[in-house]
């Protein structure tokens, strides 16, 4: 007879106490399912890949600046803002491709907000890592890796 208890499966002559009888088909499916440790590694890799995709030129990686418009917040955008600061530029193109006249202080504000959002992204990643390290197989399957970007808008 085939049986399972929590995430453990086995074959028995009689079903031990605390175990539940399962069909041979379910046993085969469960036997071929990677262990919780392997599935945690898969989920951690998925998390790492998701964060890396967000950091590099990604349309999901934007913030609402305290200056009142959306700003791309990936690593390429941070580099672009640094260049604008170095050149003392007074024009900035936002997430929606609108042009804004800005001061050096405005650019420094944008830079700081992008940096704060990057820290926020990593803090969320670290929380997910802790969740994944403790999750069961069913919890791993249900876990969605969604990230919230910061909103610096006043009011």
Predicted regions and their residues:
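A preference for well-ordered globular domain cores
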Residues: 2-155
